[in-house]
């Protein structure tokens, strides 16, 4: 207000408060990722695609903007015979080469090396349901601040899974291996 950017006096009221919530940065274990991969989703094409796109994120540890657009132009074989995904990350412009593990190869084969078009909000919606169906329901303590006081409550892990969980899970599991 002092800078003349607005003239809203409500911000000075005692009733005005900032509500914050801590982000719970979970990751999925290899066994939880396998449980998601092993689900039979053949009766729901949209869930099947969302699951597969999410798994590509787990197997590559890339951002959604990078892993959701992988196509045959990104896939090549090194002189050693190793199949890799070769891409330039959209956010940073970094060039990365990612080894293709058998689980990732199966998904690439399923879609003839071109993942179906997917949208982050759709994958986020379905992946929570898919994680629940896979039995990923461990209780996680989530903390938040309300009226200046830190509070906690329990949430099922499946409800915290989102597209970025794939990247975090891939990176964490590679580190732990």
Region locations from a protein language model:
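Alpha-helix C-terminal capping/termination sites
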Residues: 2, 59-60, 176-177
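Feature representing long, continuous alpha-helical segments
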Residues: 34, 61, 65-69, 98, ...
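Basic, Lys/Arg- and aromatic-enriched nucleic-acid-binding interface segment
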Residues: 5-64, 119-122, 167
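Short, basic (Lys/Arg/His-rich) helix/loop patches that form interaction surfaces
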Residues: 43-44, 113-117, 128-177
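N-terminal DNA-binding recognition helix of tyrosine site-specific recombinases/integrases
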Residues: 1-11, 63-65, 128-131, 135-137
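Catalytic cores of nucleotide-enabled group-transfer and carboxylate-activating enzymes in metabolic
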Residues: 36, 41, 82-83, 173
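Short, contiguous acidic/charged loop-to-helix segments that flank catalytic cores in large enzymes
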Residues: 24, 41-46, 86-95, 111-119, ...
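Conserved tyrosine-mediated DNA breakage-rejoining catalytic core shared by Y-recombinases
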Residues: 15, 69-107
């Amino acid at each position: 207000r002092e800078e003349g950017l607005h003239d809203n006096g409500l911000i000075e009221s005692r009733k005005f408060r900032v509500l914050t919530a801590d982000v719970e940065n979970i990751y999925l274990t290899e066994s939880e990722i396998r449980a998601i991969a092993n689900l039979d989703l053949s009766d729901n094409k949209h869930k099947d695609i969302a699951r597969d796109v999410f798994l590509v994120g787990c197997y590559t540890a890339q951002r959604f903007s990078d892993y959701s657009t992988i196509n045959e132009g990104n896939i090549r074989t090194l002189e050693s015979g190793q199949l890799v995904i070769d891409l330039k990350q959209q956010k940073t412009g970094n060039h990365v080469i990612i080894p293709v593990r058998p689980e990732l190869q199966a998904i690439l084969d399923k879609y003839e090396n071109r993942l179906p078009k997917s949208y982050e909000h759709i994958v986020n919606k379905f992946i929570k349901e898919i994680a629940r169906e896979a039995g990923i329901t461990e209780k996680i303590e989530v903390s938040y601040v309300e009226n200046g006081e830190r509070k906690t409550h329990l949430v099922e892990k499946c409800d915290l899974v989102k597209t970025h969980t794939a990247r975090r899970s891939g990176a964490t599991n590679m580190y732990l291996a």
